[in-house]
From Swiss-Prot:
Tissues expressed in: Expressed in dorsal root ganglia, trigeminal ganglia, nodose ganglia and sciatic nerve.
Taxonomic source organism: Rattus norvegicus
Ranges of compositional bias, category Basic and acidic residues: 42-54
SUPFAM superfamilies, alphabetized: Voltage-gated potassium channels
Catalytic activity: Na(+)(in) = Na(+)(out)
GO cellular component: axon; C-fiber; clathrin complex; glutamatergic synapse; plasma membrane; presynaptic membrane; voltage-gated sodium channel complex
Membrane-crossing segments per the record: 126-149, 155-174, 188-206, 213-232, 249-272, 373-398, 659-683, 695-718, 727-746, 753-772, 789-809, 864-889, 1149-1172, 1186-1211, 1218-1239, 1244-1265, 1285-1312, 1393-1419, 1473-1496, 1508-1531, 1538-1561, 1574-1595, 1611-1633, 1699-1723
Intramembrane positions: 341-365, 834-854, 1355-1376, 1648-1670
UniProt GO BP: AV node cell action potential; behavioral response to pain; bundle of His cell action potential; cardiac conduction; circadian rhythm; detection of mechanical stimulus involved in sensory perception; detection of temperature stimulus involved in sensory perception of pain; establishment of localization in cell
Main location: membrane
Name of protein: Sodium channel protein type 10 subunit alpha
Annotated I repeat ranges: 116-404
Upregulating conditions: Down-regulated after axotomy in dorsal root ganglia.
Length: 1956
């Protein structure tokens, strides 16, 4: 690639002139001629890579800096295109002031204006001007605002239309209209503009009052914003890309939904019309009853819906006095039904998107029966979870592909830049060699830098105080205070800011200068790493920080620096002042060149060097400037007035404050204050006592004062200039200011909302809580990356809200006050104004669309509503929101949750905690030493050797005290690193500036047991008093450490470094001095601090190996045997020997598989028994007595099992196993409850509670079922991360909860009238507040009640937020909030309308982000665990994986023998028909037609239609039966070898059966429903799956499902277990609650079956609010606590605490964790499946290979003749195909030939695979493995040893041709000689002696058709040499020279030449 500085400076930019155009025409002509010649020569197009436009020169991009400065006179002028790609296109480019590239067609615009026309040039200038686009953007935004108003005059529209027309005219004049490249209509965004303008004029011309549809197109103007802002175009590109990708998923989804809808249609049609009608109503009258006729129809209590019922035994039943009859209406305005395919499809789509599906579920089960729950389970798990998450998977992948493309683009730019830099380096080297000083070049007049004022640059140097010397020759680093202050602020020397998105890595020739790894979040480089790696950054002051840069000039290195670079912390020594003599001269005013010679000889060289260096410098300067947020004048002002350096006393005062605020304890105190302050805010509740309120107020004042002081101290200590450079400090400052404002305001004033700002202080915890920090960063990154996407989403919401308002506002019956009234009812969700319209669209995005759509369909046209709502649902919810989640997940992969943050202050906190721990250690050691001094004899002598191992406390082990390298403060670099432990290490806890790194080997446990810790502590304290012993041990410890160091070079600490933990004794004892130079050699370990193995410890671990032996473990732990010597018995002596034998016997019993099976069976039985203990148990005394008896039996068996295991395993092993503990606890619960029952204490409340814990019994099954255990293990692994996220969610939610308490506490109460059903609010005109409600309650019907879920305190606030976040029950909470007024006043309709926004904001941040973090965390965790347990593929390169996968697929295949054609001619004729592809296609078409006829069926269709459909059904059955018979006739016994045929056969049998049965059962139809047989017919649809073989994408999706099934089954099992346990709990706790909301006679906790129905429903979180509502009742008017129940208990109230815990835990476990595991598995497998499908060779390619092979090898011999190879290669499809002419390629493949000139299929397949994948070293070994595999499964190849290869054959062929030619010419010559001498007989004699029908003659006739089928093995000499690869290299004849024209010849001939 030609680099851009071939011609530097302004010469890059040339005006576009007529000569330029003529040149382009010449180029085009030359290009065409070359193309023609190529086509003629090759006969086909070149397959080489076509030239592509350069990425950084695309239109709309900014021109890179290294093209030089653009002269002012060329701005907006046509220029010759810089991109070589366009040299053959009639185009030119134009640059505006901001260097944005625009391209235009060089043809005549509108056939009137040439590129050189003045009018066109003016139009171009205007169109590229930045102000033009700004003006248009502002116009569009104003227009959008105007469209939301309804009261604006029509004339305003015309103004906008005129502006848009002007814009379009300018663009058309500048670009031309549509014919050529870069014209107006060639840009799809302009189509939008054009249509908007056209519609505006059409609307003005015709009166559009009636056709409001067209007016709504004005809304599309909002999309014009996208066409103006370039960044948005990219995201829209990604969106369109993902929509394209969704094609396969859409087809699969529609297909699955159609199948489910058909099943639903057959099962449930007409059922939802069944209602409870009053007894005595005439059935004919019932047919005409509409749902409005309430006097006849029973209404479900608490609702306005009629009660549905069914006639089945398990369907819903009617109450007394009512009978179940069919009515004409379906529920929900007649829209919820399965009566026709369309309605069934809508219902299924609703089920898939899970919008209020619990309502459909309850209605269907009530009308049809509980058994149909199976249908819903299938649809929810397959349809909803699988298909919806496939959409997520596809969108995620599309996004990843898009971002990969972006990364590739960046890398391409980087590569280009790299090359540019190399050129620069070469230039510099050349100049340096010539002795030219490029430093002086900087002042050259031509340089872009010359234009910069030197004064302008000076302040920048000041601003980078940390980077070098200032004007007054005083290095700022020399001042230790400044140094520490800057280091604290992250501005330390040795650091340099870098932008996050920096794409360039700079490399100097002699040294790597790519960015170091240590970039912190805020883009700060860690100085230590920079200096340690010796890296420098190209740029201002680059060399000042680390080691000196090495110039390409010869120079002596600075000898004193090497050590600093490598061994020590990267802290500059402050030696480098402005007058530093050594090293190259570094210009302190910020120049970037490293060359230091001082003369310029030749002007040309000077100019050349100047131009290159200056351009590069300007590029680097551009990077540098992009990081400067303020103009230089402001910086100088800030430095002058915001750095407060006064008298020495002031500095002393500052120093003292600095010490105070940077002390780790100060950090700890502030953190604690934040926590306490948060607790104070969370304690607010309603109602509060005055004293409590006063306490909270006082607390608030105290905290505000405290935080104000903290801020003031920090500002003084750091100076405002540095203080405000940290984001956290700005954040603090804002919060403190707001707190002060709030304090100054009155409590109830308008500023009380400011209190909520104080809550943001919680986020300060992120500084000391890495997980919170990471998650905030993830959300931050996502919001950042999502900036554009959020904007797109906003535009989508805006457009749809406007469309809705424009189309539907009139239909909603809007009043002047903006309230919508329909049928006398006020509507909350309507489209009368923009705000309500926005809310409706937002609600659809939340996934709730169906209820609004019903209302819309009632008030307006059904079609408009369906289209509008479904479009928003599919586009907004499924695509855009999934793209959001994709971005979130993407952020996860970038940020690992477990990674600790490299933030100095985080470590301050850890240091403070470490100090406290040290104090704790010392105290514990003092106590331990006191004890040990009295009990010294107890310690065994051998253990003293452990004493010197310094123990790590838990927090240290966790964090390894890796404090941030606050590098500037260690001044004494010259001291030996480990010379004095007393000096260096004694201070490591207190000195925050020491870098301590204690890495731990991966395999080690991070935490020591506390016992051991204490043990070691007491041992070391004992040794304090025994210096002699210590002295003896020291050499050994020393040895150990040396051993360690030798083993693992490069750490920074040895065990010595932890000296402070060993107390004064370590410090008192001088350790051997370590010389400074040896630092790196002696004390380092690369990632390991494994101590020397102690023999004692090794011996201790040996008993753990006993698991593998057939003998039991020790019974007790060492601790027990040490303290109780009696436990330590000799098992070889009597009587203990007998005991040992008993133990061995027990061990064998317990380990026996039968024992385990028996226990599993017992667990299942006992769990099953629990299911019978329902609410009706008292009514079944016999069942009750059986259950009591079995309970005792099970308890006895489990106790016996436990005792057996104790004896067999011993206490030690039993109680160190978590699963055994679980068993132990559950057995104890059973035992306790059994004993209580025997002692007749079973009615005691605590025993009752304990009995409910028996529900945990099924948990014991967990450890026994492998599948579930795997899932549980994975979950347990994820628990830390899940808990982290849960905590962070709680913190996020805490803020919203406290805000909710501030806004709504006490305001949700209202006065209700209990006479209505459901209870209705009393009108506020009658009752205005609480006291009025009580006063008017003379009738006893008015009650002042609180909404059950409210914001009266933070805990209830959490519950309310959980309901909002899961979108269940959130409507009631929102309505209460929106209607709320003052405390204790009656709510008014939409009194507080904008409170909706509180919920909108919470849903976006609290609901959307935090709940999706769960998916992210779980997926992330699974990936981590996979890596830990990773298989071989982790250690394989991508190339190897491709080969591995290709070969894996190869091995499982072999050539199939095709079904032989029958000899009978009739059978043969049928065989030919049924094996044709056309026959299959016809059958498929018939299957589709059959499916369509099934769709036509409806409920209550006419007699005639039923008959016709019956006939059509019979016709299809006959056709399919005919197909089946024909195939069986033709294929004979082979028919059943194909799975699809067997499937067809079963379907046909079932279809015939259903026809016969339905005929027989016509008379019995009333007693027996033929639904079952209807469904059987649907099995035929399954045959469509055969079609799917053709659709690769869909097959990938199904393949992903098949791969997921095993994992999904395990997850399903776990989910079932959780449901089972919870349903048992539910039966025990909530059996008697009142029927209300979600609980009724069918859905309740009275029986096990009903509990499971409820729990399945809330697995997706659907309707859990309804189930919780009655449980929250505590008394009248909702329930009666004294009502007697059937089982002897009293009351039908719930227990709110138990209910809330029950439902929230279930939702977290099932909905957030288990269901997200399901999602994680699907995403994972989808990725795998897609990878497989995108591999160069897939399963199908090999299938296709073998299918084609069958045609060429009908006998399945696995060989084909070489002559057939060319045709075979051409017949293949896909990547393996080698199209004709292919002879040349095939010969070059060097395939082995066996006798008979045949080639084995595996050899061909290998060669073709190699042809696709290219060369690879792994191929040979894989090939060997493959051949072994193939031999094992297939016919032996051994008898066919290869005797030649195709290449050898070709060589011999050529040799033969040469010999033949020579022979012929010899013969000709001879015959002429003979004819002359007339010796003809002699010639014949000679002829006879020549070789006759041999190889040569065969070669001469090789062009003739084959005669013989069998070729003899003598055709080739059977030498094995010919087989060996690589022989071709030794061959004398080079075949390629003679092959050139052979391809053409071969192509002309029908057959390829081959040996016979």
């Amino acid at each position: 690639m030609e680099l851009p500085f071939a011609s530097v400076g302004t010469t890059n930019f040339r005006r576009f002139t007529p000569e330029s155009l003529a040149e382009i025409e010449k180029q085009i002509a030359a290009h065409r001629a070359a193309k023609k010649a190529r086509t003629k020569h090759r006969g086909q197009e070149d397959k080489g890579e076509k030239p592509r436009p350069q990425l950084d020169l695309k239109a709309c991009n900014q021109l890179p800096k290294f093209y030089g400065e653009l002269p002012a006179e060329l701005v907006g002028e046509p220029l010759e295109d810089l991109d070589p790609f366009y040299s053959t296109h009639r185009t030119f480019m134009v640059l505006n002031k901001s260097r944005t590239i625009s391209r235009f067609s060089a043809t005549w615009a509108l056939w009137l204006f040439s590129p050189f026309n003045l009018i066109r040039r003016t139009a171009i200038k205007v169109s590229v001007h930045s102000w033009f686009s700004i003006f248009i953007t502002i116009t569009i935004l104003v227009n959008c605002v105007c469209m939301t108003r309804t009261d604006l005059p029509e004339k305003v529209e015309y103004v906008f239309t005129v502006i848009y027309t002007f814009e379009a005219l300018i663009k058309i004049l500048a670009r031309g209209f549509c014919l050529n490249e870069f014209t107006y209509l060639r840009d799809p965004w302009n189509w939008l503009d054009f249509s908007v303008i056209t519609l505006a004029y059409v609307g003005a011309a015709i009166d559009l009052r009636g056709i409001s549809g067209l007016r709504t197109f004005r809304v599309l103007r909002a999309l014009k914003t996208v066409s103006v802002i370039p960044g948005l175009k990219v995201i829209v590109g990604a969106l369109i890309h993902s929509v394209r990708k969704l094609a396969d998923v859409t087809i699969l989804t529609v297909f699955c939904l159609s199948v489910f809808a058909l099943v639903g249609l057959q099962l449930f049609k007409g059922n939802l019309k069944n209602k409870c009608i009053r007894n005595g109503t005439d059935p004919h009258k019932a047919d005409n009853l509409s749902s409005e006729m309430a006097e006849y129809i029973f209404i479900k209590p608490g609702t306005t819906d009629p009660l549905l019922c069914g006639n089945g035994s398990d369907a819903g039943h009617c109450p007394g006095g009512y009978v179940c009859l069919k009515t004409p209406d379906n529920p929900d305005f007649n829209y919820t039904s399965f009566d026709s395919f369309a309605w069934a499809f809508l219902s299924l789509f609703r089920l898939m998107t899970q919008d209020s599906w619990e309502r459909l579920y309850q209605q269907t089960l009530r009308a049809s029966g509980k058994m149909y729950m199976v249908f819903f389970v299938l649809v929810i798990f397959l349809g909803s979870f699988y298909l919806v998450n496939l959409i997520l998977a596809v969108v995620t992948m599309a996004y990843e592909e898009q971002s990969q493309a972006t990364i590739a683009e960046i890398e391409a730019k980087e590569k280009k830049f790299q090359e540019a830099l190399e050129v620069l380096q070469k230039e510099q080297e050349v100049l340096a060699a010539l002795g030219i000083d490029t430093t002086s070049l900087q002042s050259h007049s031509g340089s872009p830098l010359a234009s910069k004022n030197a004064n302008e640059r000076r302040p920048r140097v000041k601003s980078r105080v940390s980077e070098g010397s200032t004007d007054d020759n005083r290095s700022p680093q020399s001042d230790p205070y400044n140094q520490r202050r800057m280091s604290f602020l992250g501005l330390s020397s040795g650091r340099r800011r870098a932008s996050h998105g920096s794409v360039f890595h700079f490399r100097a020739p002699s040294q790597d200068i790519s960015f170091p790894d240590g970039i912190t979040d805020d883009g700060v480089f860690h100085g230590d790493q920079e200096s340690r790696r010796g890296s420098i950054l190209l740029g201002r002051g680059a060399g000042q920080t680390g080691p000196l840069p090495r110039s390409p000039l010869p120079q002596s290195p600075n000898p004193g620096r090497r050590h600093g670079e490598e061994g020590q912390l990267g802290v500059p020594t402050g030696e480098l002042t402005a007058g530093a003599p050594e090293g190259p001269a570094l210009d302190t005013t910020g120049q970037k060149s490293f060359l230091s010679a001082g003369y310029l000889n030749e002007p040309f060289r000077a100019q050349r060097a100047m131009s290159v260096v200056s351009i590069m410098t300007s590029v680097i300067e551009e990077l540098e400037e992009s990081k400067l947020k303020c103009p230089p004048c402001l910086i100088s002002f800030a430095q002058k007035y915001l750095i407060w350096e006064c008298c020495p006393k002031w500095r002393k005062f500052k120093m003292a404050l600095f010490e105070l605020v940077t002390d780790p304890f100060a950090e700890l105190t502030i953190t604690l204050c934040i926590v306490v302050n948060t607790v104070f805010m969370a304690m607010e509740h309603y109602p509060m006592t005055d004293a409590f309120d006063a306490m909270l107020q006082a607390g608030n004042i105290v905290f505000t004062v405290f935080f104000t002081m903290e801020m003031a101290f920090k500002i003084i200590a750091f100076d405002p200039y540095y203080y405000f450079q940290k984001k956290w400090n700005i954040f603090d400052c804002v919060i403190v200011t707001v707190s002060l404002l709030e304090l100054s305001a009155s409590k109830k004033g308008s500023l009380s909302v400011l209190r909520t700002f104080r809550l943001l202080r919680v986020f300060k915890l992120a500084k000391s809580w890495p997980t919170l920090n990471t998650l905030i960063k993830i959300i931050g990154n996502s919001v950042g990356a999502l900036g554009n996407l959020t904007f797109i989403l906003a535009i989508i919401v805006f457009i749809f809200a406007l469309v809705g308002k424009q189309l539907l506002s009139e239909d909603y019956g809007c009043r002047k006050d903006g309230v919508s009234v329909w049928n006398g009812e006020k509507l909350r969700w309507h489209m009368c104004d923009f705000f309500h319209s926005f809310l409706v669209v937002f609600r659809i995005l939340c996934g709730e669309w169906i209820e609004n759509m019903w209302v819309c369909m009632e008030v307006s046209q059904k079609s408009i509503c369906l289209i509008l709502f479904l479009t928003v649902m599919v586009l907004g919810n499924l695509v855009v929101l999934n793209l959001f989640i994709a971005l979130l997940l993407n952020s996860f992969s970038a940020d690992n949750l477990t990674a600790p943050e490299d933030d100095g202050e985080v470590n301050n906190l850890q240091l403070a905690l470490a100090r406290i721990q040290v104090l704790g250690h010392r105290a514990s050691r003092a106590i331990a030493s006191y004890i040990s001094s009295h009990c010294r004899f107890r310690w065994p002598k051998v253990e003293t050797q452990l004493g010197m191992k310094p123990p790590l406390t838990s927090s240290e082990a966790k964090n390894h005290i890796a404090t941030d390298a606050v590098s500037a403060a260690v001044g004494n670099l010259t001291k030996p690193a480990l010379s004095s432990p007393k000096e260096n290490h004694g201070d490591f806890i207190t000195d925050p500036n020491v870098w301590v790194s204690v890495p731990i080997a991966e395999g080690e446990s991070d935490l020591d047991e506390l016992e051991e810790d204490m043990e070691q502590a007491s041992q070391s304290s004992w040794q304090e008093e025994d210096p002699k012993g210590q002295q003896e041990q020291l050499p050994q410890v020393q040895k150990c450490e040396n051993h360690q160091a030798a083993r693992s070079p490069a750490s920074m600490m040895s065990s010595e470094d932890l000296a402070p933990y060993l107390g004064e004794s370590w410090k008192r004892k001088d350790s051997p001095q370590v010389p400074a130079e040896g630092v790196d050699d002696t004390s380092s370990s690369e990632g390991s601090t494994v101590d020397c193995p102690d023999p004692e410890e090794i011996l201790r671990k040996i008993p753990e190996l006993a698991d593998d032996l057939d003998e039991p473990d020790d019974c007790f732990t060492e601790g027990c045997t040490r303290r109780c010597p009696c436990c330590n018995v000799n098992t070889s002596k009597s009587p203990w020997a007998t005991g040992w034998q008993v133990r061995k016997t027990c061990y064998r019993i317990v380990e026996h598989s039968w024992f385990e099976s028996f226990i599993i069976f017992m667990i299942l039985l006992s769990s099953g028994a629990l299911a019978f203990e329902d609410n009706y148990l008292e009514e079944k005394p016999r069942v009750k007595s059986v259950l009591e008896y079995t309970d005792r039996v099970f308890t006895f068996i489990f106790v016996f099992e436990m005792l057996l295991k104790w004896v067999a395993y011993g206490f030690k092993k039993y109680f160190t196993n978590a699963w055994c503990w679980l068993d132990f606890l559950i057995v104890n619960i059973s035992l306790t409850s059994l004993i209580a029952k025997i002692l007749e204490y079973s009615d005691v409340a605590s025993i009752k509670a304990l009995r409910t814990l028996r529900a945990l019994r099924p948990l014991r099954a967990l450890s026994r079922f492998e599948g579930m255990r795997v899932v549980v293990d994975a979950l347990v692994g994820a628990i830390p991360s899940i808990m982290n996220v849960l905590l962070v969610c709680l913190i996020f939610w805490l803020i919203f909860s406290i805000m909710g308490v501030n806004l709504f506490a006490g305001k949700f109460s209202k006065c209700v009238d209990t006479r209505n059903n459901p209870f209705s609010n009393v009108n506020s005109t009658m009752v205005n507040n609480k006291s009025e409600c009580h006063n008017q309650n003379s009738t006893g019907h008015f009650f002042w009640v609180n909404v059950k879920v409210n914001f009266d305190n933070v805990a209830m606030g959490y519950l309310a937020l959980l309901q909002v976040a899961t979108f269940k029950g959130w409507m009631d909470i929102m309505y209460a909030a929106v209607d709320s007024g003052e405390i204790n006043s009656q709510p008014n309709w939409e009194n507080n309308l904008y409170m909706y926004l509180y919920f909108v904001v919470f849903i976006i941040f609290g609901g959307f982000f935090t709940l999706n973090l769960f998916v992210g965390v779980i997926i992330d965790n699974f990936n981590q665990q996979k890596k830990k347990l990773g298989g071989q593929d982790i250690f394989m390169t991508e190339e190897q994986k491709k080969y591995y996968n290709a070969m894996k697929k190869l091995g499982s295949k072999k050539p199939q023998k095709p079904i032989p054609r029958p000899l009978n001619k009739y059978q043969g004729f049928v065989f030919d028909i049924v094996t044709r592809q056309a026959f299959d296609i016809i059958i498929m078409v018939l299957i589709c037609l059959n499916m369509i006829t099934m769709m036509v069926e409806t409920d209550e269709q006419g007699e005639e239609k039923t008959k016709v459909l019956g006939r059509i059904n019979q016709f299809f059955v006959a056709v399919f039966t005919g197909e089946c018979v024909m195939k069986m006739f033709a294929l004979r016994q082979y028919y059943f070898t194909n799975g699809w045929n067997v499937f067809d056969f079963i379907v046909v049998i079932l279809s015939i059966g259903s026809l016969l049965f339905s005929a027989i059962l016509k008379s019995l139809e009333n007693y027996f429903s033929p639904t079952l047989f209807r469904v059987i017919r649907l099995a035929r649809i399954g045959r469509i799956l055969r079609l799917i073989r053709a659709a690769k994408g869909i097959r990938t999706l199904l393949f992903a499902l098949m791969m997921s099934l095993p994992a999904l089954f395990n997850i399903g099992l776990l989910l079932f277990l959780v449901m089972f346990i919870y349903s048992i709990f539910g039966m025990a706790s909530f059996a008697n609650v009142v029927d209300e909301a979600g609980i009724d006679d069918m859905f309740n906790f009275k029986t096990f079956g009903n509990s499971m129905l409820c729990l399945f429903q809330i697995t997706t979180s659907a309707g859990w609010d309804g189930l919780l509502s009655p449980i929250l009742n505590t008394g009248p008017p909702y329930c009666d606590p004294n009502l007697p129940n059937s089982n002897g208990s009293r009351g039908n109230c719930g227990s709110p605490a138990v209910g809330i815990i029950f439902f929230t835990t279930y939702i977290i476990i099932s909905f957030l964790i288990v269901v997200n595991m399901y999602i994680a598995v699907i995403l994972e497998n989808f990725n795998v499946a897609t990878e497989e499908s995108t591999e160069p060779l897939s399963e199908d390619d090999f299938d296709m290979f073998y299918e084609t092979w069958e045609k060429f090898d009908p006998e399945a011999t696995q060989f084909i003749a070489f002559s057939a190879l060319s045709d075979f290669a051409d017949t293949l499809s896909g990547p393996l195909r080698i199209p004709k002419p292919n002879q040349n390629i095939l010969i070059q493949m060097d395939l082995p030939l066996v006798p008979g000139d045949k080639i084995h299929c595996l050899d061909i397949l290998f060669a073709f695979t190699k042809n696709v994948l290219g060369e690879s070293g792994e191929l040979d070994s894989l090939k060997t493995n493959m051949e072994e595999k193939f031999m094992a499964t297939n016919l032996s190849k051994a008898s066919y040893e290869p005797i030649a290869t195709t290449l050898r054959w070709k060589q011999e062929d050529l040799s033969a041709t040469v010999i033949q030619k020579a022979y012929r010419s010899y013969m000709l010559h001879r015959s002429l000689t003979l004819s002359n001498t007339l010796h003809v007989p002699r010639a014949e004699e000679d002829g006879v002696s020549l070789p006759g029908e041999g190889y040569v003659t065969f070669m001469a006739n090789s062009g003739l058709p084959d005669k013989s089928e069998t070729a003899s093995a003598t055709s080739f000499p059977p030498s094995y040499d010919s087989v060996t690869r690589g022989l071709s290299d030794r061959a004398n004849i080079n075949p390629s020279s003679s092959m050139q024209n052979e391809d053409e010849v071969a192509a002309k001939e029908g057959n390829s030449p081959g040996p016979q």
